[in-house]
């Protein structure tokens, strides 16, 4: 349909799928899928590390979707700022500030959820794996 966001989403999905395959291959070649050690009495497996990478990719995808919602010209946040412009500068500034404060909540919740989930799975190393997966797909975005 000629939409730039459609092209971005197609590229993001393709990059995500290739990243999942790459994560699986790298995991198989480096640590395998079984237990690789213990941290603080908790067993860490290759599967845990793979899931941490998947969580990183999911967090990146969610942030893209949330960002598109808050910046899309046909979505409520942008339309509310445009509507506030009709009544004057003051209401425009107030509405813009309100939307900007609102727009930071969901990405923060998604990132914190990703950190908690990866830390529970594999400690700080699991969080590092997730962040590396996020950086691996960032080039597409």
From Swiss-Prot:
Its EC number is 7.1.3.1. Its main location: membrane. It catalyses: diphosphate + H2O + H(+)(in) = 2 phosphate + 2 H(+)(out). One of its GO terms (cellular component) is plasma membrane. The keyword Transmembrane helix applies. The keyword Chloroplast does not apply. Keywords: Cell inner membrane, Cell membrane, Hydrogen ion transport, Ion transport, Magnesium, Membrane, Translocase, Transmembrane, Transmembrane helix, Transport. One of its GO terms (molecular function) is inorganic diphosphate phosphatase activity. The chain crosses the membrane at residues 11-31, 46-66, 121-141. InterPro entries: PPase-energised_H-pump. It is found in: Cell inner membrane. It is a multi-pass membrane protein. Its cofactor is Mg(2+). Belongs to the H(+)-translocating pyrophosphatase (TC 3.A.10) family. Proton pump that utilizes the energy of pyrophosphate hydrolysis as the driving force for proton movement across the membrane. Generates a proton motive force. Homodimer. This is Pyrophosphate-energized proton pump. It comes from Anaplasma marginale.
